[in-house]
Amino acid sequence: MSLIQEFKAFAARGNVIDMAVGIIIGAAFGKIVSSFVGDVIMPPIGLILGGVDFSDLAVTLKAAEGATPAVVIAYGKFIQTIIDFLIISFAIFMGLKAINTLKKKQEEAAAPAGPTKDQELLSEIRDLLKSQQGK
């Protein structure tokens, strides 16, 4: 099998395609959450804390000189990134919790209520054979 054929077989598998779709949706979801945090959550928090813009919070280690930009530790952006992470993690947790709940309900519904007709018939045959051996 050639390398191209092997790659086609690999790429055609359903789980690879599902993974690609998940990555694309995850990237889009990450952008939505980043916008939500930066544009919706952080401005009111900054207002409550006295008009602070978190994206501008930084410690300057070395001031800008000519064309050389300043060396800063942008801890405000880091705080926003942490909040992004917490929201995304919580959303993933809630999604997985919902999926696990659905799976559990399906497993409970799929559990057989009792022996099937085949099992009952086999039990009767077994009992008859035992009674014939005992005579």
Curated annotation (Swiss-Prot):
Location in the cell: Cell inner membrane
Residue ranges of the TM segments: 9-29, 79-99
Classification via InterPro entries: Mechanosensitive_channel_CS, MS_channel, MSC/AndL, MscL_channel
Cellular component annotations (GO), alphabetically ordered: plasma membrane
GO molecular function, one term: mechanosensitive monoatomic ion channel activity
Pfam families, A to Z: MscL
Keywords: Cell inner membrane, Cell membrane, Ion channel, Ion transport, Membrane, Transmembrane, Transmembrane helix, Transport
SUPFAM superfamilies: Gated mechanosensitive channel
PANTHER family assigned to the protein according to its UniProt record, in alphabetical order: LARGE-CONDUCTANCE MECHANOSENSITIVE CHANNEL (PTHR30266:SF2), MECHANOSENSITIVE CHANNEL MSCL (PTHR30266)
HAMAP family per record: MscL (MF_00115)
Subunit structure: Homopentamer.
Similarity field: Belongs to the MscL family.
Role of this protein: Channel that opens in response to stretch forces in the membrane lipid bilayer. May participate in the regulation of osmotic pressure changes within the cell.
The protein's name in its UniProt record: Large-conductance mechanosensitive channel
